[in-house]
Structure formats: structure tokens, C-alpha cells
Amino acid sequence: GGSIPCIETCVWTGCFLVPGCSCKSDKKCYLN
């Protein structure tokens, strides 16, 4: 759903620390 925040933040590289997280427009990673 993209509403659960992950610890990781992102700029260009995407999200890698937590599987299933994706980069959103606020430069933070959220669980899909």
C-alpha cells in the first residue's frame, strides 16, 4: 500500500535495506 514507512531514505539509488520497500516522492522508503 505504500503507507508503512521503512527506516531507509532514498535519493537516486532506490531502497535496498528492507526488502519490498520502494522510493516515494518525499525521498523516503515505504513498504509496498
Curated annotation (Swiss-Prot):
Disulfide bonds join C6-C21, C10-C23, C15-C29. Coiled coil: none annotated. The keyword Nucleotide-binding does not apply. Probably participates in a plant defense mechanism. This is a cyclic peptide. Belongs to the cyclotide family. Bracelet subfamily. The presence of a 'disulfide through disulfide knot' structurally defines this protein as a knottin. This is Cyclotide glopa A. There is a cross-link at G1-N32 (Cyclopeptide (Gly-Asn)). It comes from Gloeospermum pauciflorum. GO terms for biological process: defense response.
